[in-house]
């Protein structure tokens, strides 16, 4: 798989969350001032999840945002088919990789709301095992998603997922054990327990940086 020129400009190949202006790793938590945002500011985290790890990441992002005194709502797109963006000042979209691509619910949501996402402050995060040591593939998944949806977010986070062996059925547990043996990054083939590779500090930096870029008076709410 090849990475698009647009994505190469956004990511520098390092593990983590990236600043599109300079394509450098953001390595510190920002000291945000809550007074920058109106009490009416509301952020949506819309996500697709298969085994629950992306949902946990979305909830963590929502908690970080709420800790700054801003309203945040995390919604599973599978259960929110007719979701309207009218009441939000910013949107973060997230999905995870299964069978080599992000969930169709996520792609459908982005395609349907692309014009709104391009007007509002928005960002995308991708959850995959590839983000734990195989950044070339992690970036390629996002490039493919961009090509599929036509959306080129100004901020992208690449987060490592989890191996939830105890949640898998016998066949999937067996297949995942075989797959991880061939993957870089030191993924565990120990099926007796689950293995979470998500860097929660990285997730917090992603949320903090999104808020740092959000200027309420410039947020273009979509009028019905």
What is the role of each PLM region?
Residues 35, 64, 68, 99-224:
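FMN-binding flavodoxin-like domain, especially the glycine-rich phosphate-binding loop
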């Amino acid at each position: 798989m090849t990475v698009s020129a647009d994505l190469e400009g956004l990511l520098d190949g390092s593990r983590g969350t990236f600043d599109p202006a300079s394509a450098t790793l953001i390595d510190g938590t920002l000291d945000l001032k809550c007074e920058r945002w109106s009490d009416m500011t509301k952020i949506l985290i819309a996500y697709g999840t298969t085994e629950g790890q992306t949902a946990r990441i979305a909830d963590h992002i929502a908690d970080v945002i709420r800790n700054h005194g801003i309203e945040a709502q995390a919604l599973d797109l599978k259960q929110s088919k007719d979701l309207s963006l009218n009441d939000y000042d910013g949107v973060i979209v997230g999905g995870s990789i299964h069978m080599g691509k992000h969930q169709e619910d996520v792609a459908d949501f982005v395609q349907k709301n692309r014009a709104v996402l391009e007007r509002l402050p928005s960002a995308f995060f991708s959850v995959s095992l590839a983000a734990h040591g195989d950044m070339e593939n992690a970036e390629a998944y996002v490039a493919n998603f961009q090509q599929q949806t036509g959306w080129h977010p100004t901020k992208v986070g690449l987060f490592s997922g989890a191996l939830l062996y105890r949640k898998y059925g016998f066949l999937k547990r067996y297949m995942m054990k075989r797959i991880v043996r061939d993957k870089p990054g030191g993924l565990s083939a120990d099926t007796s327990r689950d293995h979470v590779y998500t860097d929660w500090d990285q997730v917090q930096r992603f949320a903090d940086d999104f808020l740092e870029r959000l200027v309420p008076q410039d947020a273009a709410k979509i009028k019905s």
